[in-house]
């Protein structure tokens, strides 16, 4: 079964980045996915909640792309190079999705500092000990 756009109010992947949906997304991920309550949440908990909310939006776009590839019987050519490190992903993904301002406003209205959350992300390593 191919997933479709969520309309259940939980994953918020219908393409519109409303402030209220994003705030509900943060709260949902915090409570149901991470199992923490806002009163005892750490910066890492908030980072994960925001990241999972963003990931859900990216996942829907990925699914839509893969569906298009299947329908058109497309061919894919891939090139993998581990010589270039992209750095932290959250900030880049917010910009690429075009939802940075909406996430920033939703975070502010939820009493969170988006820049502090973005800065919390660790630099991903290459994995080769270097």
Which residues fall in each region the model found?
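A conserved ligand/cofactor-binding region detector
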Residues: 1-130
């Amino acid at each position: 079964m191919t997933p479709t756009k969520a309309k259940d109010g939980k994953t918020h992947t219908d393409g519109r980045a409303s402030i209220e949906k994003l705030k509900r997304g943060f709260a949902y991920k915090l409570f149901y996915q991470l199992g923490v309550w806002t009163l005892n949440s750490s910066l890492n908990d908030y980072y994960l909640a925001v990241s999972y909310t963003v990931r859900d939006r990216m996942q829907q776009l990925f699914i839509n792309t893969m569906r298009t590839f299947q329908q058109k019987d497309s061919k894919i050519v891939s090139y993998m190079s581990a010589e270039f490190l992209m750095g932290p992903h959250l900030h880049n993904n917010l910009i690429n999705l075009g939802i940075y301002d909406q996430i920033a406003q939703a975070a502010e209205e939820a009493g969170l500092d988006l820049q502090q959350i973005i800065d919390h992300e660790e630099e991903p390593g290459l994995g080769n000990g270097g």
